[in-house]
């Protein structure tokens, strides 16, 4: 595809990444209003938690969900022009994106059909996540190259651990945890997608450094051959996410839904696995980790003591209950997410 165009610029990863990003963003701006209107006509409105903040019931009623459809449409169309499709890492990530998006889409659809926030049976939901994560991690394990099962630790120059076949359950844990943590964080206008943009931006830098032999040697990080196409994929995802944020910013005209949040979380988890940045990813996605821990702590403590640690979980609702406005919570969480990203990127050199 790139040869017959005869443009040398198309050989450069930075050029293709930049235009994949811009293209996906512009597609979102162009098709966003149409997709939002179609979702409204189909009455695919966000179903709100009855035990959530009371003001959400009036402010967010009637907003269409399944916004992940907009993101992934823009990403896939953009990638058609800018990526080498037959790259094994891209194909694995594409499988993760489509499979988890389908799972989230089913969950969203059932919520709308039943008119409650229960959606897909939790057992079926986790079974689906286990199945899709198992398939994708096994694919990575067998096609991922010599470093695939090795775990690298930030801050340490030579500390690493070869998990062998145990890398498969470990990788599944990363994917499922990332998917669910991004899903839990998607509770306020612009919150999850804004934090996702920060994580995606940092992963673009890591992917580019990891794809280059010279940078990998200089920084003492693994060089993953073939991962340069992930830079372009992440660029398209970044552009699509910025475009979605255009319509998801407060007051939101569209919600991401499980269609978007489950899939984006899983995709970024898989990218972290491919780039050998699993532990770094936990720092990078620090806000998502804290949000998930707040839910776990709330549930465990309440079951044992019948007392609540937080006024409401996940953590972003706790701050709403303390009197913070929605925009204050979102922007402050974005700032914290950016600090986590800077911290994570700084560890690349500190080895």
UniProtKB/Swiss-Prot annotation:
Pathway given in the UniProt record: Cell wall biogenesis; peptidoglycan biosynthesis
Enzyme Commission number(s) from the entry: 2.7.8.13
Reactions it catalyzes: UDP-N-acetyl-alpha-D-muramoyl-L-alanyl-gamma-D-glutamyl-meso-2,6-diaminopimeloyl-D-alanyl-D-alanine + di-trans,octa-cis-undecaprenyl phosphate = di-trans,octa-cis-undecaprenyl diphospho-N-acetyl-alpha-D-muramoyl-L-alanyl-D-glutamyl-meso-2,6-diaminopimeloyl-D-alanyl-D-alanine + UMP
Cofactor(s) required, per the database record: Mg(2+)
Cellular compartments annotated: Cell inner membrane
Major site of localization recorded for this protein: membrane
Keyword field: Cell cycle, Cell division, Cell inner membrane, Cell membrane, Cell shape, Cell wall biogenesis/degradation, Magnesium, Membrane, Metal-binding, Peptidoglycan synthesis, Transferase, Transmembrane, Transmembrane helix
Molecular function terms, GO-annotated: metal ion binding; phospho-N-acetylmuramoyl-pentapeptide-transferase activity; UDP-N-acetylmuramoyl-L-alanyl-D-glutamyl-meso-2,6-diaminopimelyl-D-alanyl-D-alanine:undecaprenyl-phosphate transferase activity
Record membrane topology: Multi-pass membrane protein
InterPro entries: Glycosyl_transferase_4, PNAcMuramoyl-5peptid_Trfase, PNAcMuramoyl-5peptid_Trfase_CS
Biological process, per Gene Ontology: cell division; cell wall organization; peptidoglycan biosynthetic process; regulation of cell shape
Transmembrane segments: 17-37, 61-83, 88-105, 130-150, 158-178, 190-210, 230-250, 254-274, 279-299, 328-348
Name of the top EC class for this enzyme: transferase
GO cellular component, one term: plasma membrane
Family: Belongs to the glycosyltransferase 4 family. MraY subfamily.
Function according to Swiss-Prot or TrEMBL: Catalyzes the initial step of the lipid cycle reactions in the biosynthesis of the cell wall peptidoglycan: transfers peptidoglycan precursor phospho-MurNAc-pentapeptide from UDP-MurNAc-pentapeptide onto the lipid carrier undecaprenyl phosphate, yielding undecaprenyl-pyrophosphoryl-MurNAc-pentapeptide, known as lipid I.
Identification of the protein by name: Phospho-N-acetylmuramoyl-pentapeptide-transferase
């Amino acid at each position: 595809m790139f040869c017959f165009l005869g443009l040398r610029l198309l050989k450069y990863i930075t050029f293709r990444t930049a235009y994949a990003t811009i293209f996906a963003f512009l597609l979102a701006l162009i098709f966003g209003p149409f997709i939002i209107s179609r979702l409204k006509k189909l009455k695919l409105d966000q179903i709100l938690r009855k035990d959530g903040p009371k003001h959400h019931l009036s402010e967010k009623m009637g907003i269409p969900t399944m916004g992940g459809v907009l993101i992934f449409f823009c990403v896939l169309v953009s990638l058609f022009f800018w990526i080498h499709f037959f790259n094994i890492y891209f194909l694995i990530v594409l499988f993760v994106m489509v499979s988890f998006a389908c799972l989230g889409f089913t969950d969203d659809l059932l919520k709308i059909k039943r008119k409650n926030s229960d959606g897909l049976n939790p057992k079926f939901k986790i079974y689906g996540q286990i199945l899709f994560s198992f398939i994708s991690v096994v694919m990575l394990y067998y096609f991922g190259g010599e470093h695939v099962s090795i775990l690298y630790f930030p801050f340490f120059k030579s500390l690493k651990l070869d998990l062998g076949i145990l890398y498969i359950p470990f990788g599944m844990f990363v994917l499922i945890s990332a998917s669910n943590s991004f899903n839990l964080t998607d509770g306020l206008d612009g919150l999850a997608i804004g934090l996702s943009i920060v994580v995606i931006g940092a992963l673009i830098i890591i992917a580019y450094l990891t794809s280059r032999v010279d940078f990998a040697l200089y920084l003492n990080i693994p060089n993953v051959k073939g991962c340069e196409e992930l830079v372009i994929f992440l660029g398209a995802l970044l552009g699509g996410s910025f475009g979605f944020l255009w319509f998801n910013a407060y007051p939101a005209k569209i919600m991401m839904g499980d269609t978007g949040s489950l899939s984006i979380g899983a995709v970024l988890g898989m990218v972290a696995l491919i780039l050998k940045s699993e532990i770094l990813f936990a720092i990078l996605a620090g806000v998502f980790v804290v949000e998930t821990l707040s839910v776990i702590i709330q549930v465990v403590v309440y079951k044992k003591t019948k007392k609540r640690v937080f006024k409401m979980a996940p953590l972003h609702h706790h701050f709403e209950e303390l009197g913070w406005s929605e925009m204050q919570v979102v922007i402050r969480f974005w700032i914290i997410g950016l600090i986590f990203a800077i911290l994570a990127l700084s560890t690349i050199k500190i080895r």
